[in-house]
A protein has these predicted regions:
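Non-catalytic C-terminal accessory region of glycerolipid acyltransferases
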Residues: 14-16, 39-43, 75-168
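Conserved nucleotide-cofactor-binding alpha/beta core module
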Residues: 1-89
Length: 168
């Protein structure tokens, strides 16, 4: 059982002819969002590195793919990401990882952190709204989750003072 909170603008965006960017972090059950959307008929695509164990990598990829959640290889998948965006698909990212020296430096809990620029750039280039979400188990019961859409950013509605990738 999954309850979706604050999802009205997200489900409205699914009906538009635009790609969507989902952002979450390594918090709660970050896998349930892609699983749920795939079951509802909205396949999601995520960028990740291959697992070190090729047998486990194949098992996890096959399992995700059966429910409509597909992994694009972080090292070789640029064209695949472009294709998803051009076909108005859903890209999902775990955005709580350091982008290293080339990232956009932002404040995170008052401390400087290096964030990936790609999500903001793709949002602007492909007119894709960004939705920040997370899922947690509810009432400490198995297979009982709440998925929360916490924030939404639509590039069509950016205020004029937003001018940089860091601000997005």
């Amino acid at each position: 059982h999954v309850t979706i909170e604050n999802g009205r603008s997200f489900f409205k965006a699914l009906q538009e002819d635009r790609p969507i960017i989902l952002i979450t972090g390594h918090f709660g059950n970050f896998e349930i969002g892609g699983f749920l959307l795939g079951l509802l008929g909205y396949p999601t695509f995520s960028v990740a590195r291959k697992l070190d164990n090729p047998y486990l990598d194949r098992f996890v990829s096959d399992f995700r793919g059966r429910t409509g959640q597909f992994i694009i290889d972080k090292n070789t998948g640029y064209e695949d990401v472009v294709s998803v965006m051009e076909k108005r698909g859903i890209m999902a990212f775990l955005a709580d990882q350091s982008a290293g020296k080339k990232g956009a430096w932002v404040k995170f809990f008052g401390r400087p952190a290096s964030a990936y620029k790609a999500m903001a750039l793709m949002s602007l280039q492909y007119d894709a709204p960004i939705f920040v979400c997370y899922a947690t188990r509810r009432d400490n019961k198995p297979l009982n989750f709440t998925m929360r859409m916490v924030e939404a950013l639509d590039p069509r509605a950016l205020p004029p003072e937003i001018k940089t990738v860091q601000q997005i």
